[in-house]
């Protein structure tokens, strides 16, 4: 409603998502626009309500490059001892929460080769860079809500 008279448009193909322990992008989604999404909110659900706006076309595409990663829930065995140690160190500190290559290099002290080899396993989920038209501006706003028995609580206010 507040966007009607603005030069900015809501990005139509991005949505909010359910939050669960160690899983920031869980099963249920929170649409910004009316959709055929039939996810039903239940008591105890925690959700990130995200709105992205742009002065571009209001449609995002995924690039083929990722800068954010997360360990998958079901880790396959890793033979290389350095990569296995790296994977274990990430899991000990981050579980399945997102992280960057810079975190691995600067905070954990591993090499680019170790991280490259970890990326070659099936144990990393990649979050691709989201693209709009070149030169456009994008902004994001997010609130977290909790569905209680009788009401919805906005936890980020």
Give the role of each language-model region.
Residues 1-157:
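Active-site neighborhoods and metal-handling regions in enzymes and metal-associated proteins
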């Amino acid at each position: 409603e507040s966007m009607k008279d603005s030069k900015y448009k809501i990005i139509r193909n991005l949505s909010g998502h359910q939050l669960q322990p160690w899983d920031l992008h869980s099963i249920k989604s929170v649409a910004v626009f009316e959709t055929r999404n039939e996810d039903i909110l239940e008591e105890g659900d925690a959700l990130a309500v995200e709105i992205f706006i742009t002065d571009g076309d209001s449609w995002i595409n995924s690039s083929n490059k990722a800068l954010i990663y997360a360990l998958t829930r079901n880790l396959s065995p890793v033979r290389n001892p350095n990569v296995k140690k790296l994977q274990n160190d990430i899991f000990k500190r981050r579980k399945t929460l997102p992280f960057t290559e810079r975190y691995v290099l600067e905070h954990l002290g591993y090499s680019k080769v170790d991280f490259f080899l970890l990326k070659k396993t099936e144990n990393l989920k990649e979050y691709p860079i989201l693209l709009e038209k070149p030169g456009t501006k994008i902004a994001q706003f997010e609130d977290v809500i909790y569905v209680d028995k009788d009401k919805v609580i906005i936890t980020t206010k």
